């Protein structure tokens, strides 16, 4: 609910499709997709995009398969580990991970960067903005999900990777991964 209320999915979709600009029939990989709502935004806004929507949890992927995302003709649900992706090199034009990076430990981030850039021409990571002003969203977290959502949100805010950390982790990749960071309203 939080991403729908704040326009997050629209922002994620816009940023993802910008990475696929000029590619006819782009092959998109959504990593750590949860319920895969971004896949519906992507297929609604790009008439030829094909999306593999994935999560590490088989139960989550089964829920995707049984729902509106899984029944879409241009969406393929898959159980995938974002740190060890079972796909050939350059299988996708864009791989995208949204609001999940902060859940990975440091070695997992390095593995994600290596794997994401191996299987896709571009890897787009969208996560929260590490800044004290981000605490202003606490009331919205409470409103959209109650105490559990507020608790998870505040912990997530503390675990966000900053730009310096991402550049350092990209330098630890083999081969080194080029990283560009920027702020994208409403707070990513």
Description of each model-found segment:
Residues 100:
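Hydrophobic adenine-recognition pocket in adenosine-nucleotide-binding enzymes
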Residues 104-115:
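A short, conserved alpha-helix within the catalytic core of class I
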Residues 29, 35-84:
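Class I SAM-dependent methyltransferase SAM/SAH-binding core
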């Amino acid at each position: 609910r939080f991403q729908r209320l704040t326009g997050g999915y629209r922002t994620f979709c816009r940023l993802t499709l910008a990475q696929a600009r000029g590619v006819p029939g782009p092959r998109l990989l959504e990593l750590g997709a949860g319920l895969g709502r971004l896949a519906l935004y992507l297929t609604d806004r790009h008439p030829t995009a094909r999306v593999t929507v994935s999560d590490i949890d088989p139960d989550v992927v089964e829920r995707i398969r049984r729902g509106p995302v899984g029944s879409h003709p241009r969406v393929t649900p898959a159980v995938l580990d974002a740190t060890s992706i079972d796909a050939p090199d350059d299988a996708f034009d864009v791989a995208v991970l949204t609001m999940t990076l902060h859940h990975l430990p440091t070695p997992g981030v390095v593995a994600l960067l290596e794997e994401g850039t191996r299987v896709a021409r571009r890897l787009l990571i969208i996560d929260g903005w590490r800044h004290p002003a981000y605490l202003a969203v606490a009331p919205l977290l409470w409103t959209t999900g109650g105490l559990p959502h507020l608790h998870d949100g505040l912990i997530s805010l503390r675990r966000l990777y900053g730009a310096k950390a991402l550049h350092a982790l990209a330098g630890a990749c083999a081969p080194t991964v080029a990283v560009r960071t920027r702020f994208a309203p409403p707070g990513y």
